[in-house]
């Protein structure tokens, strides 16, 4: 027993001598520390974001190792590299995939939703005092939110102008606003059908019927305009959809008089436009959604114009960060009675099902 205590005393004395015999001495010591930054991803995965090493030095170049001394044991600490290895072995490290706009946004409660000024691109809006309304199915919801945007229907919208593109570049195609312009009408009044019915009235009726069809299939529905008028310009409507919905569908009828059929407004095949954000990150999703809608309409007996696509530089597309389409469901002379609108709603809903793989 005495021999054991004697050996321990000698060992402790040796440790103190190695450390300089004085805790206040810094001339012959080197402090080494390591920190591993670990955070949780949105999917709940543990992600190692970095290893930080710091060495605070002594005046000498002698490398020393800190040791912990207890009454009965002496333990040598590992080096920085060994510590890092141990952390890596003990921690499950998994790279997360970059977030895409196809992912569902955070679910919001049903009710009115206005434009949040902190949202991306919200500052470009000029008319934004109105509210959209979010509806949810009573049961069997699928968690997907579709923004149904009844085109037009904003009093005073044609008296205001907004920037065509977030980066200030001019339009590349002509429509309501000509190519080369840098500002566009905030919300146009729309056309009038051959029977005297305003387009805004028909788009709202279409939106209400589509809402019911989508709710019956388990979708949440964000009614961008839930009445005859909403004080939200095209940018405000788009930004609200960006932050609440999984996809954005604007309902329109064209101003021609040939009853030419349905088509979607495709993203212009112009390099400068397709390389501009947020178009660059989303135009393929816009096109895929447009094609799905046309296929759904066609399979339900709706007449399709040409190949179902017409290129157009739209404010909606220029500011959209979710799959987004302006769908033209006919023109001034097209049937817009209740039965026809129901048929159109089924075709659109089938296209939405197809796009989301349902």
Language-model segments: residues:
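Catalytic-site microenvironment of enzymes
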Residues: 2-14, 18-358
């Amino acid at each position: 027993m005495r021999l054991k205590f004697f050996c321990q005393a000698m060992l402790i004395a040796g440790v103190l001598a190695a450390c300089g015999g004085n805790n206040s001495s810094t001339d012959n010591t080197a402090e080494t520390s390591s920190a591993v930054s670990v955070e949780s991803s949105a999917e709940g995965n543990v992600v190692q974001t970095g290893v930080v090493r710091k060495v605070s030095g002594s005046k000498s170049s002698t490398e020393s190792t800190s040791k912990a001394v207890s009454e009965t044991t002496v333990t040598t600490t590992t080096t920085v590299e060994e510590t890092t290895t141990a952390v890596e072995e003990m921690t499950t490290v998994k790279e997360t995939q970059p977030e895409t706009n196809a992912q569902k946004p955070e679910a919001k409660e049903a009710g009115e939703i206005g434009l949040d000024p902190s949202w991306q691109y919200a500052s470009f809006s000029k008319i934004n005092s109105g509210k959209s309304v979010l509806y949810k199915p009573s049961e069997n919801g699928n968690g997907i939110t579709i923004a149904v945007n009844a085109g037009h229907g904003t009093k005073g919208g044609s008296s205001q102008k907004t920037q065509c593109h977030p980066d200030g570049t001019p339009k590349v195609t002509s429509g309501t606003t000509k190519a080369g312009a840098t500002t566009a009408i905030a919300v146009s009044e729309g056309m009038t059908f051959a029977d005297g019915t305003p387009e805004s009235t028909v788009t709202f009726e279409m939106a209400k019927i589509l809402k019911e069809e989508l709710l019956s299939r388990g979708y949440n529905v964000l009614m961008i305009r839930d009445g005859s008028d909403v004080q939200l310009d095209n940018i405000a409507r788009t930004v609200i959809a960006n932050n609440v919905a999984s996809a954005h569908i604007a309902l329109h009828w064209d101003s021609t008089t040939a009853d030419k059929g349905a088509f979607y407004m495709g993203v212009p095949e112009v390099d400068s436009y397709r390389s501009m954000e947020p178009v660059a990150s989303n135009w393929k999703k816009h096109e895929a959604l447009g094609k799905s809608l046309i296929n759904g309409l066609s399979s339900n007996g709706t007449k399709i114009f040409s190949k179902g696509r017409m290129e157009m530089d739209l404010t909606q597309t220029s500011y959209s960060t979710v799959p987004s389409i302006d769908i033209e469901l006919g023109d001034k002379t097209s049937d817009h009675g209740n039965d026809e609108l129901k048929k159109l709603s089924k075709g659109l809903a089938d296209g939405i099902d197809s796009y989301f793989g349902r």
